[in-house]
Amino acid sequence: MAINIMAAFEETPPPLDFVFNGFLAGTVGALVAPGATGKSFLALEAAFAVAGGVGADLLGVTPKHTGKVAYFAGEDPENVLITRLHSLGHHIDPAARENVAHSLILEPVMGNRINIMDEATIAALVKGCADCRLIVFDTLSRIHQLDENSNGDMARLVGVLEYIAKTTGAAILYLHHVNKGSARDGQTDQ
């Protein structure tokens, strides 16, 4: 449906719903960096902040509202994830630990061959994440079977992520590696 331009001119819009500064609910964002630079730890800490609130905000991202977080970890096995949780848990207060334990779903999906382009997978994600504030996919390459060098394939993939974000109202954060050539040549913005 088209925007009513006159209404937009005349009526005060509702406040924007930021999950954390600069990241709107219902949108898709990316954390892109070379491998082994801490993307997963950073994303997990952001998930802690949203799930646990002030006492779990190790990054200082100050989420406006807490909420449920679904984190799909495709590159690390369960024992590594448990080690990270144990380590981070020492840095948050007991009440925040309870909030994180209640509101964070950390799903190890390494080796599960997820294909987010599959309609049944999309439907399951929309249903399972309907009450989420944040959804994290770590990493993008582990949730599809498309050609990452194809602009068309990647546009379709981002379209699916946008659909899930719009349908659930959650912000979606995906982690992605820059290609090896770009990282080697110092062109990490590629």
Name each region found by the language model.
Residues 51:
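Gly/Ala-rich phosphate-binding loop of Rossmann-like dinucleotide-binding domains
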Residues 25-29, 67-68:
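Pre-Walker A (Motif I) flank of P-loop NTPase domains
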Residues 1-19:
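N-terminal pre-Walker A segment at the start of P-loop NTPase domains
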Residues 14, 19, 54, 62-152, ...:
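Conserved inter-motif catalytic segment of the P-loop NTP-binding fold
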Residues 42, 46:
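Hydrophobic positions on the alpha1 helix immediately C-terminal to the Walker A/P-loop
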Residues 30-32, 36, 40-41, 72, ...:
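Phosphate-binding/switch region of NTP-binding enzymes
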Residues 22:
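Walker A/P-loop-proximal flanking segment of P-loop NTPase domains
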